[in-house]
């Protein structure tokens, strides 16, 4: 992960934020990849409220002339309080420097609803499938954008990451 940390540090993300996020990495998580003219933060393996907030913080602190785009899906297996956890993440999104929020999944709609309450200028869109999301992103992404892909493994956002890296 040292090359990823170096890349993030060059973009003037505080070292404390880098260390905090690196401590949560393992195996298939948090790959930072240069794709064409944008940066992809592929963290599509798993999601919890804390891990999504940590990833959003890293995205928010990236120094870029482009947009900061969060592509999120449902957090699965959170039990009966799942809607509230999704709302909590939505409220957190409103406090970040994320410019665009794109989601898949029914519970993820809470992200948009809550984020809009505090930040109505946030550009958002909900997609009914990963295929629809991929088709949109392939034409939407521009030079210098930074894109975070984060969601529970069962939502299969890895499919989105792989398509963007192709």
Give, region by region, the residue ranges found by the protein language model.
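Gly/charged, well-structured mid-domain segments that form the phosphate/adenylate-handling core
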Residues: 10-41
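Short amphipathic alpha-helix with an adjacent loop that forms part of the alpha/beta core around
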Residues: 134-140
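Single conserved hydrophobic/aromatic residue that forms the stacking wall/gate
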Residues: 1-5, 9
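Residue-level marker for buried hydrophobic side chains located in beta-strands
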Residues: 40, 70-71, 147
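Active-site beta-alpha connecting loops in nucleotide-dependent enzymes
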Residues: 26, 44-119
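ATP-dependent carboxylate/acyl-activation modules
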Residues: 28-31, 154, 158-160
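Short acidic-hydrophobic, aromatic-tinged amphipathic segments that line or gate anion-handling sites
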Residues: 123-133
């Amino acid at each position: 992960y040292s090359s990823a940390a170096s890349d993030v540090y060059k973009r003037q993300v505080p070292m404390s934020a880098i260390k905090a996020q690196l401590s949560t990495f393992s195996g298939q998580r948090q790959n930072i990849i240069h794709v064409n003219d944008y940066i992809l933060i592929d963290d599509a393996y798993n999601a919890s409220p804390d891990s999504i907030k940590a990833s959003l913080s890293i995205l928010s602190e990236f120094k870029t002339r482009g947009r900061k785009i969060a592509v999120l899906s449902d957090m699965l297996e959170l039990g009966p309080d799942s809607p509230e956890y999704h709302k909590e993440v939505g409220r957190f999104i409103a406090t970040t420097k994320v410019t665009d929020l794109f989601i898949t999944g029914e519970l993820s709609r809470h992200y948009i609803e809550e984020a809009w309450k505090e930040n109505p200028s946030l550009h958002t869109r909900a997609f009914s499938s990963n295929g629809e999301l991929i088709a949109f992103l392939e034409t939407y992404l521009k030079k210098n954008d930074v894109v975070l892909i984060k969601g529970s493994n069962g939502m299969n956002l890895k499919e989105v990451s792989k398509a963007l890296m192709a």
